[in-house]
């Protein structure tokens, strides 16, 4: 046999296999609901608890008090109103977390740009979404919004945020880290973490490490980041990425899914844009954009969840405000 033809026969199956792999389509985002039962909103609290998705409060506009309703769903499509007027009032950009088998909501903003506006440092908990207990009227950390709170190594950690939403300045931004065993009593872990003061950022826990990334400030001095920081103890932080490939942004969402950190959506002022992208990383250093054929429209201050082995996206500002729900399911061996 001619050696040239023999070589082509051996190589052809390899090229053909690689080509098939490259053409394998990515799973699309699926629209679960065009209009959920709750009023379109952004900046709401979100949780997964006792086999349900939960939406708490949020923002309709800057000239009314924020909503105090609580909604739950077992499938993302059909929603039940659990409470119309929860006792907490600071429900714009609150921090929410499930801890000690309870739903917790803390911090947040009240009354938009109206007189009597304020930030909070109260902590509330509930086991059913209807009955809420005031765990702490005034935690040791200063009243603030748009911080992050995570469970990490058996304790709650609260990081960053801003003390004054529409009327603050750079001094209102925080880069402190607080820790609590029970959500009531908090201790200062570090007054100035290595990352710059910021709000509207996100945090994640993966492989025994805690990450802080993105965020910045909205007004009056806008700035946004796309850096990534990591810690193994909540106190000592190191920068692993100065500028991730996703554009710097605030008001985005994040989850951990399939052992990757995900960054989704958000807003930037330069360019002035709501982002509709999704990026994932296993280490905060190397990022890949997820680009299926069908995805959700760009938005900011939406909710994201990991529920029933899928990522869910709900609500947010396009504009207009929306109350749609989307989901993405990736194979377990993806």
Over which residues does each language-model region extend?
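N-terminal secretory signal peptides that target proteins for export/translocation
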Residues: 1-2
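Sec-dependent N-terminal signal peptides
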Residues: 5-14
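Intrinsically disordered, low-complexity Ser/Thr- and Pro-rich stretches
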Residues: 13-16, 231
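Sec/Tat signal peptide C-region and signal peptidase I cleavage site
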Residues: 18-22
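Kelch-like beta-propeller repeat domains
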Residues: 23-334
């Amino acid at each position: 046999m001619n050696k040239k033809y023999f070589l082509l026969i051996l190589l052809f199956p390899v090229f053909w296999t690689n080509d098939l792999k490259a053409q394998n389509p990515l799973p699309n985002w699926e629209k679960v609901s065009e209009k959920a039962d709750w009023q379109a909103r952004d900046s709401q609290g979100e949780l997964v608890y006792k086999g349900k998705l939960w939406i708490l409060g949020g923002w309709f506009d800057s000239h009314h008090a924020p909503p105090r309703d609580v909604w739950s769903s077992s499938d993302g499509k059909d929603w039940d109103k659990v409470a119309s007027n929860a006792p907490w009032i600071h429900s714009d950009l609150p921090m929410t977390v499930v801890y000690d088998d309870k739903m917790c909501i803390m911090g947040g903003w009240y009354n938009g740009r109206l007189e009597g506006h304020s930030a909070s440092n109260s902590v509330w908990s509930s086991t059913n979404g209807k009955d809420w207990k005031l765990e702490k009227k005034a935690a040791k950390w200063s009243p603030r919004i748009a911080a992050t709170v995570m469970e990490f190594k058996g304790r709650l950690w609260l990081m960053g945020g801003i003390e004054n939403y529409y009327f603050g300045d750079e001094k209102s931004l925080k880069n402190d880290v607080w820790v609590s065993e029970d959500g009531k009593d908090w201790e200062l872990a570090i007054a100035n973490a290595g990352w710059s003061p910021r709000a509207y950022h996100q945090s994640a826990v993966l492989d025994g490490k805690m990450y802080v990334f993105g965020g910045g400030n909205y007004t009056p001095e806008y700035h946004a980041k796309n850096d990534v920081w990591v810690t193994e103890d909540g106190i000592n932080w190191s920068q692993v990425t100065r500028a991730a490939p996703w554009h710097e942004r605030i008001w985005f969402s994040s989850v951990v899914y399939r052992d990757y950190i995900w960054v989704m959506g958000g807003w930037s002022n330069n360019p002035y844009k709501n982002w509709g992208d999704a990026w994932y990383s296993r280490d905060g250093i190397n990022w890949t954009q997820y680009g299926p054929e069908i995805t959700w429209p760009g938005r900011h201050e939406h909710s994201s969840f990991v529920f029933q082995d899928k990522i869910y996206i709900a609500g947010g500002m396009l504009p207009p405000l929306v109350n749609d729900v989307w989901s993405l399911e990736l194979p377990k061996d993806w």
